[in-house]
A protein has these predicted regions:
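An N-terminal, well-structured beta->alpha segment
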Residues: 1-63, 150-167
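Short, glycine-/Ser/Thr-/acidic-enriched flexible segments
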Residues: 7-9, 14-16, 53, 81-82, ...
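Ferredoxin-reductase
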Residues: 39-118
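Glycine-rich loops and low-complexity Gly/Arg-rich segments
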Residues: 26-28, 71-74, 100-102, 123-127, ...
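Residue-level preference for alpha-helix termini and adjacent loops
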Residues: 1, 6-10, 17, 79, ...
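Gly/Ser/Thr-enriched, mixed-charge loops and adjacent short helices
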Residues: 111-167
Length: 167
């Protein structure tokens, strides 16, 4: 279940597990919220990062496809990155939001989906509950899995350099 900060759970089949459908619903709900919240903005953008856990890169790519299918520009890291760099990249690119696929300190059978706002911090009130409401409205048939490759920009070493210079 999507809660404050995102999702976290054991990977596997079912609505109470981390899989392409629960990650897809979370991303579709966040996309819906961003499109409502920033309806007057010409370009909405997000950063997508991930860690080294099983399926993290897969969940990141699926999320990038869903964001882009909803008209949202995606800055997708080319490989795993630490959470602080994902937060930095959100601010660096002037994005409205971002996600990081990571289960942090949890055991290896877990994965997670952390949502961040435009300041690079985890989503807080009132956005957290509004995003949860949007995620809870999503059905499997609502999820737009067919990405728009023109809206996905792969990022990597160029961001690493700026990030490391700032630390």
């Amino acid at each position: 279940e999507f809660g404050t900060g995102g999702l976290r759970g054991i990977m596997g089949a079912g609505t109470n597990r981390m899989n392409i459908y629960t990650v897809g619903a979370a991303t579709q709900g966040l996309s819906n919220y961003l499109n409502k919240c920033f309806a007057g903005k010409k370009d909405i953008s997000v950063v997508v990062g991930h860690d080294c856990r099983n399926n993290s890169d897969k969940f990141a790519k699926i999320s990038a496809d869903i964001f882009s299918a909803n008209g949202i520009k995606v800055y997708l890291f080319d490989d795993l990155r630490p959470t602080p760099e994902v937060s930095f990249a959100i601010r660096h690119f002037g994005c409205q939001s971002g996600i990081n696929i990571t289960a942090s300190h949890n055991p290896r059978e877990y994965n997670g989906y952390k949502a961040y706002w435009d300041d690079g911090a985890q989503v807080l009130a009132p956005h957290d509950t509004a995003i949860i409401d949007e995620v809870n409205k999503v059905t499997v048939t609502d999820i737009k899995f067919n990405g728009n490759k023109d809206l996905i920009q792969i990022i990597g070493k160029e961001v690493d350099k700026v990030y490391l210079d700032m630390v």
